[in-house]
Amino acid sequence: MSNNIYPLTTEAAFTVASHLTFEDKRECTEGHGIDPFLLAIGALSGDDSYFFKAPDGKSAAIGGVENDGKIWMLCTDSVKEFPRTFARDCKRMIDSRPEKLLWNVVDKRNTTHIKLLRFLGFKFLREVLYGPKLLTFIEFCKINVR
């Protein structure tokens, strides 16, 4: 995988949930109708949950893959300080996954995540109204052919 990606810890989950980017916090609360801390707590029980430690030692992002290939991520502004390192580490992690299909939805307003997803090789399928506020989200997926 990467020297900067580690199994998720309680400390990393709470650090990231406490310092989310504006876009990620908005996507959690407005788009999914859930408190980011609840997502972080839930992620601790998953076997495939990770955190990205930036070169300056800060916990900069958490993410993971659920059993059905549903991929997710929450970031702090620290990832913007090391964008190339973060993107390359994410690519290594995604490319190492055994699932044939990785998928989820992303808030159309979250342009940072959309740009990263495009770099990682995900395809955007269609716009859908999603969540309690029926906001525009974009379905995306990546088919791993090996």
Language-model regions, residue ranges each:
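Short amphipathic alpha-helix that is part of the acyltransferase structural core
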Residues: M1-I34
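Active-site rim helix/loop that mediates acceptor-substrate recognition in acyltransferases
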Residues: C28-D47
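Conserved beta-strand in the GNAT
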Residues: F51, D56-W72
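A structural microfeature
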Residues: A61, R126-L129
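A short, internal acetyl-CoA/4′-phosphopantetheine-binding micro-motif in the GNAT/acyltransferase core
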Residues: W72-R88
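Conserved acyl-CoA
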Residues: R88-L102, L120
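Conserved beta-strand-loop-alpha-helix junction that forms the acyl-donor binding cleft
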Residues: W103-R118, L129-K133
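C-terminal "cap" of GNAT-fold acetyltransferases
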Residues: Y130-R146
